[in-house]
Design a protein with these regions (language model features):
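Core catalytic alpha/beta fold that binds nucleotide/phospho-ligands
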Residues: 1-125
C-alpha cells in the first residue's frame, strides 16, 4: 500500500545559481559527500544536482513532514544501483519517521533536461 507520494520539479539554472553564489556551504547543507562526488564527475553536473534536489524535495513531500522535526536535506541520499537505477537512502530523522510510518519500500525516479529536473518518490509498506 502507498504510504506517501511526492513529486518535485527543480529548475537547473536556479540550482546552478545557488551553487555558484553560495558554494561549499550550500553543497554541504543540501548534498551528501557521495552525492557531491557523483555530480562533480559529470560535465552536466548542474542537471545532476537539480535531479537530486528534486528527489529530496519529493521525498520530504512523500514523508509528509516538511522540513520540520529535525529533518535535514542530507537525511535523503540519492544512490545508484549497479544498473544505474537511482535509489533513495534515508538516515537521521527522516529514517526514524519513515520507520514509524511503516515504510518498507521506496521507489525513486529522476529525469532531467538542460533546464529542468523532475523526481517522483513513492513510500510503500
Amino acid at each position: 500500500m502507498i504510504i506517501g507520494l511526492g513529486v518535485d520539479i527543480a529548475e537547473v539554472p536556479r540550482i546552478k545559481a545557488a551553487i555558484e553564489r553560495r558554494g561549499q556551504p550550500f553543497l554541504r547543507r543540501v548534498y551528501t559527500p557521495n552525492e557531491i562526488a557523483y555530480c562533480e564527475s559529470f560535465k552536466n553536473k548542474f542537471e545532476r544536482y537539480a535531479g537530486r534536489f528534486a528527489a529530496k524535495e519529493a521525498s520530504m513531500k512523500a514523508l509528509g513532514t516538511g522540513w520540520r522535526g529535525g529533518v535535514r536535506w542530507v537525511d535523503f541520499e540519492v544512490q545508484r544501483e549497479q544498473s544505474g537505477r537511482p535509489i533513495l537512502a534515508l538516515t537521521g530523522e527522516a529514517a526514524k519517521i519513515a520507520a514509524a510510518l511503516g515504510v518498507r519500500r521506496i521507489s525513486l525516479s529522476i529525469t532531467h533536461t538542460e533546464s529542468q529536473a523532475l523526481a517522483q518518490v513513492i513510500f510503500e509498506d
